[in-house]
Amino acid sequence: MNNKTIFPYRLFVEGMNDLHVVSSLCENHKLTENFNIEVCGSDKNVIRQFKIAITNPAVYRRIGIMVDADNDVKGRWMQLVDILMKSGKYDCENLELPLDGLVLYPLNSCDAIIGIWIMPNNNLAGMLEDFVLQLVSSENVLMQKAEDRK
């Protein structure tokens, strides 16, 4: 992503690998670079930055977070829903995480639109690396060699 231009759209990610994967996917799919990626350094910092960002609607019009499920995708989801509920800015009643990620519109149009993706696929425990593995064809020669070395 072009981090020299400041856009009103922000994506919070855990680490540099997340930034590189998102940037590569955008480039590969020829998506417009109209958002900035902020590397937060850890899942805790992503959550902290998310809490701060949704309290100030003037800063970002759209806020995305991409965070690893690690061992508990449901727990991670509930953590994020709790933040949204406590903000009072979103209708969280019966809110579920769709397999293709969440886009949540605010109750007041002055507040930010929220996007959530829980790695690897909004459904399973795991992380960025598991997501990337899903992108590789099982017929890939290098992947087969890597699997053989396990």
Pin down the residues of each PLM region.
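Activity-critical C-terminal alpha-helical subdomain
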Residues: 75-150
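Acidic, glycine-rich catalytic loops of TOPRIM or P-loop NTPase phosphate-binding modules used
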Residues: 1-71
